[in-house]
Regions:
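Terminal presequence/propeptide segments associated with secretion/organelle targeting
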Residues: 2, 8, 15-249
Length: 249
């Protein structure tokens, strides 16, 4: 968490450095931007953001395709925003146990609640495939371009699955379509709810306070990744699965 705090603080500080405004992928972080981060107090080597075996990017997850999260323990605990857990919290709430209204916490592993159609993805690799894509889509209309990108995504995913069947590839345009990156993800589908605060705390201030600083709100919820007990790898939900043990957190 200390590393993540430093990263976030470093990135937020760039708002005051006019020449370095904007958002950048860790894979493609320009040297002037990194130097600006250093001038604001960031002390880690650049490959600790992306590239090193224990880089910060290895602990950050795509949370169910619509949020982000961070792994914070050797037993696979993941912190994300409070609203990112709404689907799971609502699904488990009843009249007798209104977890959205009153919050929830699991006293031990056995009380952690499984969730259908929720997952986390770890970014394993990101590469610039702009030249390859531009060659394929030159002169094509929007529909044909989408078809070509889908085909390329499927082909790259098939190659990635030869390395690990839990891998898949996503191709996305960046910088208003001037760049295309292919990102390889590893997907874990057994994700269980561990803790959430009452909605009155998690949504305190509502949209009035959203995007403001400081905020007086408990904007977080906690989940745990579960894995195959034999491989520590991804697995569909099973009562026999065990908490995931990440190499870094």
């Amino acid at each position: 968490m200390k590393k993540l705090t430093l990263l976030v603080a470093g990135l937020l500080s760039l708002g005051s450095v006019h020449a370095d405004e904007g958002m950048w992928t860790l894979y493609n972080l320009p040297q002037p931007v990194f130097q600006a981060m250093q001038s604001e107090g960031f002390t880690l080597p650049q490959d600790m953001l992306y590239g090193a075996p224990n880089a910060i990017s290895n602990t950050v997850v795509n949370f169910s395709g619509f949020c982000s999260g961070v792994v914070v323990s050797p037993d696979g605990l993941v912190f994300t925003n409070h609203h990112c857990g709404f689907g799971a919290i609502n699904a488990h709430s009843t009249v007798e146990h209104d977890y959205m209204l009153n919050g929830f916490y699991a006293k031990d592993f056995s009380e952690e609640l499984p969730n259908e159609n929720m997952f986390v993805q770890f970014m394993k690799k990101q590469e610039d495939i702009t030249d390859r894509v531009n060659t394929l889509i030159a002169g094509k209309n929007a529909d044909k371009t989408a078809e070509i990108l889908d085909s390329l995504t499927n082909a790259m995913t098939a190659e990635a699955k030869k390395i690990d069947k839990s891998f898949h590839v996503e191709i996305d345009p960046f910088y208003e379509g001037n760049k295309y990156y292919a990102t390889t993800y590893q997907v874990f589908n057994d994700l269980r709810l561990v803790f959430t605060v009452p909605k009155s705390m998690g949504k305190f201030g509502g949209e009035t306070d959203n995007w403001m600083w400081p905020r007086q709100t408990c904007d977080f919820s906690v989940f745990r990744i579960y894995a195959d007990p034999k491989t520590n790898g991804p697995a569909e939900y099973s009562k026999d699965n065990v908490p995931y043990h990440p190499a870094h957190w």
